[in-house]
Amino acid sequence: MPRLIPLLALLLCASASAELRADITKGTPHGYGAMKVYDGQTLLFQATTRGLSAVTASKFSPDGRWLVNLTDQGYVQLWDVHKGERVKTFLAPFARVLNADFTPDSTRLLLNFWGDSTPTNFWQGTRSSFWSLEPLQRLGTLDGKGWDIGYSGNVHFDAAGKRMVTASFRFFGGQAAAVYDAATGAPIATLSRVPYPPGALQTGGAGAADARLAPDGRRALVYDVAGRLAEYDAATSQLLKVRGKVDSAGAGAQLERFAREGK
C-alpha cells in the first residue's frame, strides 16, 4: 500500500502538461523511493516502492493519462495516472534508459529495447519496440528491414500525428532515418543516407543525426552527421534535394520551421 511521507522532493518531470509533475524522493526508507504526482497543487496519488529509487527522469503522455519513469538500473516503469497504479515494468538489456516517447494521441509508447524478459538473446533485447497502451501489448518492432534503423530516443511526428520519423544512433553511429505509421508502427520508408558530393573521400553516405516531417507528413527533412540538410519524399524515400551544410544551431532552426510550415 502507498505510504504517506514528508515531501523533500527531487523534481524529475518532463511533462506534456505544465500542470502535471512527478515529485520523487529517494531513500525513504533506505533503498526505496517515494513519488507524489500532482496536477497543479492537487495531489493525484502517491506511492512508495523500491523501483522508484533508480528513477532519473519522468514523462507524461500528452493527455496526462500515462506516466513513464526512466531509470539507470535497466528498466522503465509505466504508471496509470488516473488509477494511481504501476501498470508494467519494462526490462532493458542495458542499465541507463535515456528516453521513451508517447505518440501524440497518447495511445502508443516507443521504447528503444524489446521491453520484457522473453527475447532469445541480447541483440533481440536491443530491438526498439512499439506498444499499445490499452490493451497493453507490444505491436511490433521499429527496425524495419534492418537493425541499423529504428527508435533510439529521437522521434518526431507530423501535424496530425499519423506519421513519425526516427533518426537512429543505434550501434554507435548515425544510421538511416525511417518513417513509420504512428498508429500501427508499420514501416513506410527508410530514407537512404545522404550521399557525399563527387570527389569526397567518404563513401556510402552519411547517417541521420535528426529529422522532421512536414506538417502533412509527405516530406522529411534530415540533418546528417556530416552537417548537411536533405529533403526526402516520406512515402517513397526519394531524395528530393540536398540543402547544403549548416551548423547545428542553423539546422535546428530549419528543422523546426520545416515541421511547422513545410519550408
UniProtKB/Swiss-Prot annotation:
Q: Where would I find the WD repeats?
A: 53-89
- Keywords recorded for this protein, A-Z: WD repeat
InterPro entries attached here?
Answer: Quino_amine_DH_bsu, WD40/YVTN_repeat-like_dom_sf, WD40_rpt
Q: Give the matching SUPFAM superfamilies.
A: YVTN repeat-like/Quinoprotein amine dehydrogenase
Sorted alphabetically, which PROSITE patterns does this protein's record hold? Answer: WD_REPEATS_2 (PS50082), WD_REPEATS_REGION (PS50294)
What's this protein's name?
Answer: Uncharacterized WD repeat-containing protein DR_1725
Tell me which species this is from. Answer: Deinococcus radiodurans (strain ATCC 13939 / DSM 20539 / JCM 16871 / CCUG 27074 / LMG 4051 / NBRC 15346 / NCIMB 9279 / VKM B-1422 / R1)
